[in-house]
UniProtKB/Swiss-Prot annotation:
InterPro entries reported in the protein's UniProt record: AAA+_ATPase, G_ENGA, GTP-bd, GTPase_Der, KH_dom-like, KH_dom-like_a/b, P-loop_NTPase, Small_GTP-bd
Residues annotated as binding GTP 2: 207-214, 254-258, 319-322
Secretion signal, residue range per the UniProt entry: none
Single GO MF annotation: ATP hydrolysis activity
Name the UniProt record assigns to this protein: GTPase Der
Organism name: Psychromonas ingrahamii (strain DSM 17664 / CCUG 51855 / 37)
């Protein structure tokens, strides 16, 4: 589960600057949900190989009414969702009444709170930050968010202990040179495939409020008549519900929470961005639910973007399809083709969660997506497919030399990662990379999951070596030198 960091503080202390620094906003998803989360923004950040979620809260004013209203309506919710709270203060402006009021609220929360003095560039940090120790929240950390000074060290301290148990990904560095590789044991690959097939499929139901997440969850559970209970260890109100269908085990991750029967028809659902983002990271397959009558919104695209960024398998359910006119149905299908053309690997189902129409077919696509994302494929098969792709459409020329593809192997799963080794492969045009991706997808029959391809240029294993001639070669060379000298006379 991704840890969550909340940025709290009065206006203009640099929360948004730090947020952008951590999330690298141009490269990472930044989900802004106006009207649903008020002024809170959510983004994904990364330090080395460790990822976490950042919440940027709105500023809190110093008046008593503003403190109570905004803290209760916005920042207090962000603090409740967070594993660590970064309380930002302005080192240049000094401590204010608003800072003291916020500190009073934070002391009442059972959270890890870190006082972060921003804008310490160009000043004596120890001197200007000394007064903030009076807030009674412990150590004061110095940063300059705009320049990135001290940010990394501060985050490492705040999230210390959260990544101790993170499993390391498989290391494929032994295949780097490409001189030789050991073919995988087909029996071991098959055994691993069978092991994964026996595991429950973790399926996250995500979507905007009121698209029918709870209705679909209860429809699925009602059809199967299973016992509903919460698995121990779940956090932040996401409900993990075990169930089975046709001898296949599932764990439904319901970000909206399971509703009692009397509340199924409620028109308003609680929406938590944090629960949704964490469910995406924790699941195997994402079921994105879209309201057919509203069409595709920017919020749908934000959720879709986070799903693709996480590399999760994807199935799309267009809900509330019943009762629509043929004209409206064609209009919705046209919009889907236009706006979702870049995810042609995901299957789209038109359903009615309320009446159960089309719900049964979702399982087939979910299983296909899971099996595709965890498919174990040998190096020989991947290399053979790569060779066929190059034979059907030769790699382009780079300068006076043609790009050469040497071999391919699996680099990871969920999503499938294919590593291609060769010469000048990093100079391949994006169009040819897409061609290879689509060729692998068709050849392997992979649907419902993105494929990632990584290109590696093998180093010359003989670089830096000096040729050592055998005695016989030395004798021949000496004779050639003598002959060359005689011919000049």
């Amino acid at each position: 589960m991704l840890p969550v960091v909340a940025l709290v503080g009065r206006p203009n202390v640099g929360k948004s600057t730090l947020f952008n620094r951590l999330t690298r906003t141009r490269d990472a998803l930044v989900a802004d949900f106006p009207g649903l989360t008020r002024d809170r923004k959510y983004g994904q950040a990364k330090i080395d190989e460790h990822e976490f979620i950042v919440i940027d809260t709105g500023g809190i004013t110093g008046d008593e009414e503003g403190i109570d209203a905004l803290m209760a309506g916005q920042s207090l919710l962000a603090i409740d969702e967070a594993d660590a709270v970064l309380f930002l203060v302005d080192a240049r402006a000094g401590m204010t009444i608003a800072d003291e009021a916020i500190a009073d609220h934070l002391r009442k929360q059972d959270k890890k709170v870190f006082v972060v003095a921003n804008k310490t560039d160009g000043v004596d940090a120890d001197s200007v930050c000394a007064e903030f120790y009076a807030l009674g929240l412990g150590e004061v950390y110095h940063i300059a968010a705009a320049q990135g000074k001290g940010v990394r060290q501060m985050i490492e301290i705040a999230l210390d202990g959260f990544f101790d148990d993170v499993e390391q990904e498989d290391d494929f560095s032994d295949l780097e040179t490409g001189l030789e590789f050991v073919e995988e044991d087909e029996a071991l690959l098959l055994k691993e495939q069978e092991r994964l097939a026996a595991l429950p499929i973790k399926l996250a139901l995500i979507g905007r409020p009121n698209v029918g997440k709870s209705t679909l969850t209860n429809r699925i559970l009602g059809e199967e008549r299973v016992l509903v209970y919460d698995l121990p260890g779940t956090t932040r109100d996401s409900i993990y519900i075990p169930m089975s269908r046709d001898d296949r085990e599932y764990i439904l991750i319901d970000t909206a929470g399971v509703r009692k029967r009397k509340k199924v028809n409620e028109t308003v659902e609680k929406f938590s961005v944090i629960k949704t983002l964490q469910a995406i990271e924790d699941c195997n397959v994402v079921l994105l639910i879209i309201d057919a009558r509203d069409g595709i919104s920017d919020q749908d695209l934000s959720l879709l973007g986070f799903t693709l960024n996480a590399g999760r398998s994807l199935v799309i359910a267009v809900n509330k399809w019943d009762g629509m006119t043929e004209y409206d149905k064609e209009r919705v299908k046209s919009e889907l083709d236009r706006r979702l053309g870049f995810i042609d690997f995901a299957k789209i189902h038109f359903i009615s969660a309320l009446h159960g129409t089309g719900v049964g077919h979702l399982y087939e696509s979910v299983e296909e997506a899971y099996d595709s994302s965890t498919k174990r494929i040998s190096t020989s098969i991947l290399t053979r497919i790569m060779t066929m792709a190059a034979a059907d459409h030769e790699p382009p020329m780079v300068g006076s030399r043609r790009v050469k593809l040497r071999y391919a192997h699996a680099g990871g799963y969920n999503p499938p990662l294919i590593v291609i080794h060769g010469n000048q492969v990093k100079k391949l045009a994006d169009s040819y990379k897409r061609y290879l991706m689509n060729y692998f997808r068709r050849s392997l029959g992979i649907m419902g999951t993105p494929i990632r391809i990584e290109f590696r240029e093998g180093t010359n294993p003989f670089a830096g070596r000096r040729n050592k001639l055998t005695p016989n070669q030395m004798y021949k060379r000496q004779r050639l030198v003598k002959f060359h000298k005689k011919s000049k006379k």
